[in-house]
Amino acid sequence: MDYSEIMVRHGELSTKGKNRMRFINKLKNNIQDVLAPFPAIAVRSDRDRTHVSLNGTDYQPIVEALKLVFGVQALSPVYKLEKSVPLLVTAVQDIMTSLYRDGLTFKIATKRSDHAFELDSRELNSLLGGAVFEVLPNIQAQMKHPDVTLKVEIRDEAAYISYEEIKGAGGLPVGTSGKGMLMLSGGIDSPVAGYLALKRGLDIEVVHFASPPYTSPGALAKAQDLTRRLTRFGGNIQFIEVPFTEIQEEIKNKAPEAYLMTLTRRFMMRITDAIREQRKGLVIVNGESLGQVASQTLESMQAINAVTSTPIIRPVVTMDKLEIIEMAQAIDTFDISIQPFEDCCTIFAPDRPKTNPKLGNAEKYEERFDIDGLVQRAVSGIVVTEITPEIVNDEVENLIDALL
């Protein structure tokens, strides 16, 4: 027998009361986005399950994709069949025969939500267990911790049989907690911050600053590939490329070297906030980790934050670098992040950046710039690309070859 579908059990959605169906419908849409590379599948949801019909598609890549989607508590490959006792008996016998090995223990666990069905749960357990013994007389039944728990569900529309339960990613469906702008540089930290924001249901749009010719097409492709990795957790992501060359050259030419990083980050924050307002976001997300670099001391954060009243979420702020690296490896962004392309934060980095910049000094140096004009020109020049979870090469070099 081949699996008919993957049955998805919802996570925290069971606690969402009157908003439950909104959360479930969002999860359904996210699953459809993530499974877009598999055109034969079909997705439908009810109040306590989402059903992914395979329609002949190999179940294994579908399971691997669904395991990453936030809002999924658990999933099971299942056999779907008509609610017929003879069909159930045959299916259970075939499944257990295919699984059998010497010493195998099992139990039947039946759940009947269709109370009009001819047998109740206890009667079905007895009947189906007996059917297994007919074809496997040496198998052993065991009620506690058996090797195989064969789950049989009798629902209104059909009967379902499964024996695997695979842990999902948990969290909330992406998009159920509002929208935020993720400042993604291309380093290790910001993709991890984006992943953690996605886990709590935040719909992120990626803001990436590009300064050609100082930053290369490879750096842009790298940032887009990192964004593509993040789409596996909740579907399509809007990638916003911001032209930043003019601003960086202005800062380089007119500001003291010690304040280059502070002023650069203040402009980035202003621009991200303007894009957030334009695109109806609620928060800004970044990958700052307290004390990790000069721009991430409390004094630096205070001086940079002063340009906006928008909430700033820093998911990795208390994490050690090694913890961030481990998470980046777990979510498969690390190998991309360490590709050797310079980003806007590194091309003009001073040898001795100010670790305790004074807000008054930053504001004084900014009097040398046409702040509103620079920000407006940057925002008006953005390029928005929708990044989808299509199948791509693992290596950034292959992406660069396609650009050349």
From Swiss-Prot:
Single GO molecular-function term? tRNA binding
Q: Could you name the Gene Ontology cellular component terms for this entry?
A: cytosol
Q: What class of enzyme is it?
A: transferase
Localization:
Cytoplasm
An annotated GO BP: tRNA 4-thiouridine biosynthesis
The UniProt catalytic activity note for this protein reads: [ThiI sulfur-carrier protein]-S-sulfanyl-L-cysteine + a uridine in tRNA + 2 reduced [2Fe-2S]-[ferredoxin] + ATP + H(+) = [ThiI sulfur-carrier protein]-L-cysteine + a 4-thiouridine in tRNA + 2 oxidized [2Fe-2S]-[ferredoxin] + AMP + diphosphate; [ThiS sulfur-carrier protein]-C-terminal Gly-Gly-AMP + S-sulfanyl-L-cysteinyl-[cysteine desulfurase] + AH2 = [ThiS sulfur-carrier protein]-C-terminal-Gly-aminoethanethioate + L-cysteinyl-[cysteine desulfurase] + A + AMP + 2 H(+)
EC numbers? 2.8.1.4
Any idea where the THUMP domain is? 60-165
Is the keyword Endoplasmic reticulum assigned to this protein?
A: no
The coiled-coil segments of this chain are none
Residues reported in the UniProt entry to bind ATP: 183-184, 208-209, 265, 287, 296
Which pathway, metabolic or otherwise, does it act in?
A: Cofactor biosynthesis; thiamine diphosphate biosynthesis
Q: Which Gene3D superfamilies match?
A: 3.30.2130.30, HUPs
Q: Which Pfam families match?
A: ThiI (PF02568), ThiI_fer (PF22025), THUMP (PF02926)
Query: What keyword terms does UniProt attach to this protein?
Result: ATP-binding, Cytoplasm, Nucleotide-binding, RNA-binding, Thiamine biosynthesis, Transferase, tRNA-binding
**Of which family is this protein a member?**
Belongs to the ThiI family.
Task of the protein:
Catalyzes the ATP-dependent transfer of a sulfur to tRNA to produce 4-thiouridine in position 8 of tRNAs, which functions as a near-UV photosensor. Also catalyzes the transfer of sulfur to the sulfur carrier protein ThiS, forming ThiS-thiocarboxylate. This is a step in the synthesis of thiazole, in the thiamine biosynthesis pathway. The sulfur is donated as persulfide by IscS.
Provide the protein name: Probable tRNA sulfurtransferase
